[in-house]
């Protein structure tokens, strides 16, 4: 009754979703975008949404058949970002309990994105580079204890894993400047977190998957012509991170 022309859902199948408003909008173009990284599927044998916003990297042409929606392709990356996302950093490593001379790998994804395969790769890097530390987001005590215990069982001192407390968003974005490399997760990449890192000029090493949520960091890197940081398997992921660690000139050029 509100005569809405275009309805864009930014939540999808997430908390407080109102996705099923869409079928009630009879003369409205409906679009699935951003909040839910994937197809919303069918309702009563019809697509729940008319369109999904994507790009050529996120949804390769051969994968269109897996989406109920028609694909609207943006020219660079499906995720737009503002130019002034960069934040001045007014703190130092000691403020966050990080040794000043450490090489800092960060991964500010939520803990549920950390799989055993990815975490093992991170531990491989910690073992390879004794002066490095891993800086993660503090999610909850269970995740913190499990990750630390797993590291200890695999011969890595858990004190080399430092957990970042939650802080205001501006400070969170700014503290990326204290890290050297952002290590991505799979099968659920960094999304907004990847944009935060790139805004602060931190290189991201990602492992490209086959699904929407596993290709987001790759999409952002591809749009910046940083395809060298998009890897195909866990071995090349470790190799890419190692090159960035060892070659400071290459890292600065990136």
Predicted regions and their residues:
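Alpha-helix C-terminal capping/helix-to-coil transition sites in glycosyltransferase folds
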Residues: 2-3, 48, 175-178
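Glycosyltransferases and closely related glycan-assembly transferases
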Residues: 3, 16-29
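Conserved catalytic-core segment of nucleotide-activated headgroup transferases in glycan assembly
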Residues: 76-168, 175-177
């Amino acid at each position: 009754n509100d005569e809405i022309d275009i309805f864009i859902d930014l939540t999808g199948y997430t908390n407080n979703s109102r996705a099923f408003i869409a079928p009630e909008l009879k003369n409205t173009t409906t679009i699935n975008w951003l909040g839910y990284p994937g197809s919303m599927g069918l309702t009563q044998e019809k697509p729940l949404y008319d369109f999904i916003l994507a790009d050529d990297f996120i949804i390769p042409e051969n994968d269109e058949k897996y989406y109920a929606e028609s694909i609207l392709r943006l020219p660079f990356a499906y995720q737009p970002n503002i130019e002034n996302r960069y934040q001045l950093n007014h703190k130092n490593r000691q403020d966050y309990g990080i040794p000043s001379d450490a090489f800092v790998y960060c991964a500010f994804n939520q803990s549920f994105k950390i799989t055993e395969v990815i975490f093992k790769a991170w531990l491989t890097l910690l073992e390879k580079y004794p002066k490095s530390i891993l800086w993660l987001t503090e999610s909850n005590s269970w995740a913190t204890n499990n990750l630390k215990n797993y590291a200890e069982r695999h011969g890595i001192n858990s004190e080399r894993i430092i957990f970042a407390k939650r802080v205001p968003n501006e400070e969170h974005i700014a503290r990326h400047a204290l890290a050297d490399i952002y290590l991505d997760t799979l099968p659920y990449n960094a999304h907004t977190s990847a944009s935060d890192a790139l805004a602060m000029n931190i290189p991201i090493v990602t492992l490209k998957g086959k699904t929407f949520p596993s290709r987001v960091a790759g999409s952002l890197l591809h749009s910046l012509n940083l395809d060298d940081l998009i890897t195909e398997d866990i071995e090349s992921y470790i190799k890419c991170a190692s090159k960035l660690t060892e070659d400071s000139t290459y890292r600065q050029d990136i």
